[in-house]
Amino acid sequence: MHQMTLAEIAKGLEAKQFSAEELSRALLARIAQLDPQLNSFITVTEDLAIEQAKAADARRAAGENGALLGAPIAHKDLFCTNGVLTSCGSKILTGFKAPYDATVVEKLKAAGTVTLGKLNMDEFAMGSANESSHYGAVKNPWDTSRVPGGSSGGSAAAVAARLLPAATGTDTGGSIRQPAALTNLTGIKPTYGRVSRWGMIAYASSLDQGGPLARDAFDCALLLGAMAGFDAKDSTSVDQPVDDYLAALAQPLAGLRIGLPKEYFGAGLDARIGEKVMAVVEELKKLGATVKDISLPNMQHAIPAYYVIAPAEASSNLSRFDGVRFGYRCENPVNLEDLYKRSRGEGFGAEVKRRIMVGTYALSAGYYDAYYIKAQQIRRLIKNDFVAAFKDVDVILGPTTPNLAWKLGEKNADPVSAYLEDIYTITANLAGIPGLSMPAGFVDGLPVGVQLLGNYFQEGRLLNVAHQYQQVSDWHKQAPTGF
């Protein structure tokens, strides 16, 4: 059963080949057996899962028949889950059990999904390797000496290892797409405002967006359809109807205009990844797409701009974690200042502290104009590049990552080298457009991802292109040995 996609699970449950409870018990046993090799879960919610699975079976017995009714998933551990530890991968949230469900959790629960647990992640979603978690590094099931990507590394590793069919993630600078690429999954970051951020603990409020990771575009469409939509509780949510993503999948690609940005294929890209990307382009041409070269000239400024804006927002967002109201508190503080300093000093990890300091510096009176305002101006130029490009093309295609999954610990001494791994993904967050990564083959046994970028609220088109490619390829069906 663990090899089944969400679509196959829905058919099996409908045909009464197995119950949601049987499926959940089988996957919980698999998690107990295999996750010690990966460390993808922070919390396994066994009792909750069985309770939800029984409820899903009862709903089905009463005649209900939703596509996600009884589907087992797990949530990245920054979505608040009522009564369950929500840690953000940080010591500072030790023991914090949210008193409510995030909107994403609520919507998926209403659709009948079964929550198997909370997934490991880079601390407060800051990282590209899932090595900064207080709960330990996550390992890539394709090679357990390598990183799975980040920050949604637990989500990616668990789905890739067939511990569960799909999971939620979040993407601030590539945190769904990059791990999807490094673990052979399909993952989509929706348009900013498409999925509610209420109850999703913030890293950088103007960049964060939740989305699904799954094995194929069909399953992503299923999940995104349930996750997306306006939420009055989230002031950044956009009140626009949600497309029928499943209906969009079948659209033929004849006449689709694909743009290849020259900036995505220059220095820094592993040539073997470039070859895999061009092989995907050739397949899409056979399916009727046309291809043209384009330019996104301001992409070169994306990483510096992102690493001013995101830490600036993080330094503000993370100021609420002070040892007073919830989570970790230092022992025997001598006064209030000592409580703040030591609780935060002991509670946050090195990467989070680094970004808080960078962000506080960028927002300080003497440097605000030189850094923060300048970064926001660059952000507007990047957005303008995309607006211009989408006048001539429907989808922009390129590699998701410049390199294959690297060895655990390899980039720890040089954080900038890890930041550069997000070079192709960050621009979508700065501009707020949707982006998807899909499997495109293997180099030396390690997965390669291709990224598709679309215009605002064109998630359906990205899922359509990925689905059509997955009808003529089987990369997405390959599973790691030993899992």
Swiss-Prot record:
Annotated HAMAP family: GatA
Active site: 76, 151, 175
Role summary: Allows the formation of correctly charged Gln-tRNA(Gln) through the transamidation of misacylated Glu-tRNA(Gln) in organisms which lack glutaminyl-tRNA synthetase. The reaction takes place in the presence of glutamine and ATP through an activated gamma-phospho-Glu-tRNA(Gln).
A cellular-component GO term for this protein: glutamyl-tRNA(Gln) amidotransferase complex
Alphabetically ordered keywords of this record: ATP-binding, Ligase, Nucleotide-binding, Protein biosynthesis
Signal peptide: none
Family (UniProt): Belongs to the amidase family. GatA subfamily.
Subunit structure: Heterotrimer of A, B and C subunits.
Catalyzed reaction equations: L-glutamyl-tRNA(Gln) + L-glutamine + ATP + H2O = L-glutaminyl-tRNA(Gln) + L-glutamate + ADP + phosphate + H(+)
Name this polypeptide is given: Glutamyl-tRNA(Gln) amidotransferase subunit A
This enzyme's EC code(s): 6.3.5.7
GO biological process, one term: translation
Species of provenance: Ectopseudomonas mendocina (strain ymp) (Pseudomonas mendocina)
GO MF, any single term: glutaminyl-tRNA synthase (glutamine-hydrolyzing) activity
UniProt xrefs under InterPro entries: Amidase, Amidase_CS, Amidase_dom, AS_sf, GatA
